[in-house]
Amino acid sequence: MAEFIHGNQSIHYELAGVREFRLRTPVLLLHGNGEDMHIFDNMIAPLLGAKGFVLMDSRMQGESFSLDGGGEISYSAMADDAAALMDELGINEYDIVGYSDGGIIALLMAMKSFKVRRFFTIGANTDPSGLTAKAVREIKTALRRANHKGDERTAALLSMMLNEPHITSHQLAGIIAEATIILGKKDTVIDRKHSERIADAIPHGTHVLIEGAGHDVPDRKSVV
């Protein structure tokens, strides 16, 4: 595993798959809230001989950490970290697969950069209103638990889910990359109509429902 320093953040990442991945439009993989890059291990295992992958732990998650104990925890900051890493690696065109929070980061990156050729979001939302009532209750319960334990990092990550993002349909309309917005048919975290509206707002957007899957699509299907 390698380390990339971006501001006051140590971002840990890994390159996997074909060696000449820069020549084959590599895939950047972005995990969900409080997770790490290894959620994608099973999904990419059959594809390592044909594709190149960049896996990373988003800031203050997994093996990534703040060098001075500070730093902003936001989707925008995480998107900036990921874009800076790809620039550091000299990758000028790439695809993204983002799961849950990683899907939000993928949307933000596609809004800002022409280097994103196409992207897949799995169980992502563009506004806290896209979370189901059940998900909000569970996040608030987890947040109270984290605050009680004095776990500031986890509390900040959970608060982010309740207060961000705020991506408008106008911003989505400016995305030029091809987008596949994926939702498990049994997902109890993201509202289906909200997910469908994301795809409808992106000019080259498609919505896909995965039969039999909940919010944990990376464990069920290969979408790359």
Task: Pin down the residues of each PLM region.
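Flexible "cap/lid" loop of the alpha/beta hydrolase fold
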Residues: 104-115, 119-146
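Conserved HGGG/HGGXW glycine-rich cap/lid loop of the alpha/beta-hydrolase fold
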Residues: 9-65
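Active-site loop/oxyanion-hole signature of alpha/beta-hydrolase fold enzymes
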Residues: 45, 55-94
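Short beta-strand/loop motif that positions the catalytic acidic residue
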Residues: 175, 181-183, 187
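Conserved alpha/beta-hydrolase "nucleophile elbow" surrounding the catalytic nucleophile
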Residues: 33, 94, 98-100, 184
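Active-site nucleophile elbow and catalytic-triad environment of alpha/beta-hydrolase enzymes
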Residues: 156-171
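Conserved small/polar residues in nucleotide/adenosyl-binding loops
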Residues: 223-224
